Amino acid sequence: MLEKKHQQTFVQTEQNLFFAQVVNFLKQLYVLIKPGVISLVIFTALCAMLLAPSDKSLFIKGVALILIAMGASGSAILNMWFDRIIDSKMDRTKFRPIPSGNISANTALGIGLIFSFFSVVALFFFANIKASILLAFTILYYSVFYTMYLKHRTAQNIVIGGLAGALPPVIAWISISGDQIFYPLISVSYTHLRAHET
């Protein structure tokens, strides 16, 4: 009887430990996707969806919004993965999930790639190819061009890289309005240029 009680206690302890590890991992993943940035992506994309002419169902709109946020999360994770060495040397960033060791670099890279790939492919099926291609371009622009090139070569990196932050509402517009692409592109181009005038 006593042995059985010990076994039950051991199993309960193992379950509690596993649950705590899962919760901690999700907390670290939440930090990894840069929630402040993602909330802005969701907000601007939602505004675009509300303004765009469309007869799509709320379900399709909701899925498209989630996929855009997932793509943005994937690129944010890839950004953190690439900057992990630099982050480990700065007081402001050394406690981020990867440099602190709370999430391994390989795990972060895998999640970032999965989020990015899945969001692009799924947006193609749930929305259209134009939105999918533009989402792929945005992910590559931010996680490769901005993160790996601009940040380390020019003080104007935010100005040029800011295009990645301006594209989610364009993707949202296109994802539910189909071919009506030129108006949002002109609008975002004008807004981006005016915002960074010197």
Named regions from a protein language model:
Residues 43-44, 51-82, 133, 140, ...:
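Membrane-embedded alpha-helical segments that form the functional core of polytopic membrane enzymes
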Residues 72-99, 194:
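Acidic (Asp/Glu-rich) catalytic motifs at the cytosolic membrane interface
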Residues 34-48:
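The first (N-terminal) embedded transmembrane alpha-helix
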Residues 44, 160-174:
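Small-residue-rich segments of transmembrane alpha-helices in multi-pass membrane proteins
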Residues 1-26:
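Transit-peptide-like, low-complexity N-terminal presequences
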Residues 191-198:
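Conserved small/polar residues in nucleotide/adenosyl-binding loops
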Residues 92-133:
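Multi-pass membrane catalytic core of lipid/isoprenoid biosynthesis enzymes
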